């Protein structure tokens, strides 16, 4: 799926399933999610244990092989340019980060992937979008509440937002 199609898919479906901490069964999970109407899946990197990164990239690759163009597959908890490259090499189509790291956003865009960095404040949201983000992940949205998201959308209605974290 090209970058435009991935962005359009996320915009239309408004849901990205987040998968964290599985040892196996990614292909079956992706098929079940697809059967339930989910069209985008994010497989997260474990920052505490880099030895699991091979498993994460393997899962991204396996889901891409299994689902083909039916489902957009991305990497989450991407905090470095190195992880952007690992995700891209595995076949990721989008990158999700917990923060706004401009180097990560630039590398993501250079590689032709959709960028979804995390931000919380209006200033961070604007900075992420100005740096090239396709969507800005408002995180932790569950802690902030739906009223916060509604309030942010008023003055920042030109920036595509994703509410993530305890939603």
Walk through the language-model features, giving the residues of each.
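Active-site/ligand-binding-proximal alpha/beta "capping" segment
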Residues: 135-167
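C-terminal helical cap(s) of enzyme catalytic domains, especially alpha/beta-barrels
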Residues: 107-114
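Short, ordered loop/turn segments at secondary-structure junctions
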Residues: 45-48, 78, 99-102, 120-121, ...
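Conserved N-terminal beta1-alpha1 strand-loop-helix module at the mouth
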Residues: 1-90, 100, 110, 158
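Short amphipathic alpha-helical segments and helix-helix/interface helices
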Residues: 60, 105, 149-150
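Conserved beta-strand positions in the central sheet of alpha/beta enzyme cores
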Residues: 40-42, 74, 96, 116, ...
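Catalytic cores of alpha/beta
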Residues: 28-29, 80-90, 123-133, 148, ...
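Short, glycine/charged-rich "phosphate-handling" switch motifs in NTP-dependent
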Residues: 93
């Amino acid at each position: 799926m090209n970058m435009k199609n991935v962005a359009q898919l996320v915009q239309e479906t408004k849901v990205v399933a987040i998968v964290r901490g599985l040892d196996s069964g990614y292909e079956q999970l992706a098929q079940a999610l697809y059967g339930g109407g989910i069209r985008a899946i994010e497989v997260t990197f474990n920052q505490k244990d880099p030895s699991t990164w091979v498993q994460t990239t393997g899962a991204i690759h396996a889901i891409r092989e299994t689902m083909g163009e039916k489902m957009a597959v991305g990497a989450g908890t991407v905090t470095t340019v190195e992880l952007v490259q690992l995700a891209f090499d595995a076949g990721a189509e989008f990158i999700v980060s917990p923060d706004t790291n401009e180097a990560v956003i630039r590398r993501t865009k250079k590689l032709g992937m959709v960028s979804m960095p995390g931000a919380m404040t209006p200033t961070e949201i604007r900075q992420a979008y100005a740096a090239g983000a396709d969507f800005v992940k408002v995180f932790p949205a569950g802690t902030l509440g739906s009223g916060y998201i509604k309030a942010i959308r008023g003055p920042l209605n030109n920036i595509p937002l994703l509410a993530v974290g305890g939603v």
